[in-house]
Amino acid sequence: MSSRTVLAPGNDRNSDTHGTLGSGRSSDKGPSWSSRSLGARCRNSIASCPEEQPHVGNYRLLRTIGKGNFAKVKLARHILTGREVAIKIIDKTQLNPSSLQKLFREVRIMKGLNHPNIVKLFEVIETEKTLYLVMEYASAGEVFDYLVSHGRMKEKEARAKFRQIVSAVHYCHQKNIVHRDLKAENLLLDAEANIKIADFGFSNEFTLGSKLDTFCGSPPYAAPELFQGKKYDGPEVDIWSLGVILYTLVSGSLPFDGHNLKELRERVLRGKYRVPFYMSTDCESILRRFLVLNPAKRCTLEQIMKDKWINIGYEGEELKPYTEPEEDFGDTKRIEVMVGMGYTREEIKESLTSQKYNEVTATYLLLGRKTEEGGDRGAPGLALARVRAPSDTTNGTSSSKGTSHSKGQRSSSSTYHRQRRHSDFCGPSPAPLHPKRSPTSTGEAELKEERLPGRKASCSTAGSGSRGLPPSSPMVSSAHNPNKAEIPERRKDSTSTPNNLPPSMMTRRNTYVCTERPGAERPSLLPNGKENSSGTPRVPPASPSSHSLAPPSGERSRLARGSTIRSTFHGGQVRDRRAGGGGGGGVQNGPPASPTLAHEAAPLPAGRPRPTTNLFTKLTSKLTRRVADEPERIGGPEVTSCHLPWDQTETAPRLLRFPWSVKLTSSRPPEALMAALRQATAAARCRCRQPQPFLLACLHGGAGGPEPLSHFEVEVCQLPRPGLRGVLFRRVAGTALAFRTLVTRISNDLEL
């Protein structure tokens, strides 16, 4: 057994010895695991894992869905319940004391969050060298990838998603928690397209009147006071980021963007952005309430909940603050199932009442997560299903059962587990269980094998899992003009191919950590906040050099993946004796031309400039220091009919209840579709392996060749309509342009 170490104040117990992780003392239940009848648990297991498959605790590891230099995220299946989860595996030996402190803070914060639109933490497992965070798996990937694949959203759909985001962020603020890294990459989607906010690695607790002074976040989403080096209360920086997110959902581009940090800083501090012609007046009005330069005049989320735009289509069901229901720890059905697994009623009660994030609590919570075939998901008022069937739902709940919650607060009479129905469609796969193996050795070994340099690990629990991988191209692109027809709306035709996507797509904002905070001089703006082409004072540069992060180009692309300028910053602490912030970086304004200019609030007062330092140079140099991509080696045997590296009991494709992300459909048998996909990917010169019966993991290019590296997955899924299958493409790493080209070629070869 691996030894367990103290994680943080709490009552966690590890999944093997039942030792208390949080308090550092052994539980009186310690020996019960070895003495418990393993046969009873094996016989009653809903799912199990073969001995040769890697596992961590009670979880069978399936595949990597995100990785970085110190951690990775694995898709896993809970052996006892068959539910899919995402496990973040962190190598503690690579972290300094400051990073460890932030990690423990992230865990502590996630333990206290219980909202249907926030990724749920199920279990914490810790060994001497490794920390495992077992979290909710959002199978539909990131909002970022959704926008890449579908283009901008119509306001009706953007409103449904944004209501969920506002509810979750307001819930965090009510608990005195500020996220500080809200962006499209950290907004995940479950199987029913409900929002799940992830990555609380930069979150912190705040107290009104006690200022925070750490500059962190993705620059295009960062509030102007962060660029100025000012201290802040906390919620106001999240509110600015929400405005950027809303603009991105509706327009498919960023309001503030550019080729380098200097341009980005100038654009943000000026507060100018273009309003596309298709944006409604009400949407423009709510944006003006978010994107206010003066944080004291920025709106509050309580005010936003009463805004006209956010409640259109929800008459009588105004968005209200989320009321957290009491945890249901007395579900006799789940307890009986767990007793059949071999747990005792005493340890179940102790774990649940003490809120220990151990295997007992995780099993109980996962048993309460409904499968796709039944039960509500999400809370009334915020689910996206309202976009598709408003007459059959109330306040956005996708099930007809939600009518009982009409015109009421979210989940006022439903339990937490009813709100968060699990997004896993996969059924159990019986096989012998081998619980005596070391529960963590395989995870630690894989972490060491696949560690990549130069990145902070993604905390994403999304299906695509591409955040942690370096992009194959360092090119930075700015936003296109949203007035142009090349920005597509999301297509309703599920059989259409990705050919309608623009040639250049969105740039992913990765996560970096900076040891110093960039300073900034305050901008000098006209009193009315308007641009003056002849005499508007420019923001003085923070450094003699601009450090361009993108090659010059006349055409700018929409939110392209892999930009260093859109990476998450984390600055050091600002000492009180410092006068202010300096240095900065800026962004070129998003759309270059539009008939309408957005308004902004009264500009910030001009401040006394102070000498700049070489901090900006250090910051930009750090961001532009790229590590050459090491293509992930896709191991395993060649795909043949006689050697398949999966459990043969999984003979049916995964069921997609909501096939909104499927581009290609066919009535062919799934086996025939897989054979056609293998031929098409081979014709496209892709290197593929088949980790699951109806899933291909593919690599193309890279390894010093002329073509950039592209890593993607192709899956054959069962659609709700009988006899109809869908082909689902998911990008894991690489540029959107290369991915789109490959998808188009493979789709054409399939001739569906």
From Swiss-Prot:
GO terms for biological process: cell division; cilium organization; intracellular signal transduction; microtubule bundle formation; microtubule cytoskeleton organization; nervous system development; positive regulation of cell cycle; positive regulation of cilium assembly. This is MAP/microtubule affinity-regulating kinase 4. The modification Phosphothreonine is found at residue 214. Belongs to the protein kinase superfamily. CAMK Ser/Thr protein kinase family. SNF1 subfamily. SUPFAM superfamilies: KA1-like, Protein kinase-like (PK-like). One of its GO terms (cellular component) is midbody. It comes from Homo sapiens. Serine/threonine-protein kinase. Phosphorylates the microtubule-associated protein MAPT/TAU. Also phosphorylates the microtubule-associated proteins MAP2 and MAP4. Involved in regulation of the microtubule network, causing reorganization of microtubules into bundles. Required for the initiation of axoneme extension during cilium assembly. Regulates the centrosomal location of ODF2 and phosphorylates ODF2 in vitro. Plays a role in cell cycle progression, specifically in the G1/S checkpoint. Reduces neuronal cell survival. Residues 703-752 form the KA1 domain.
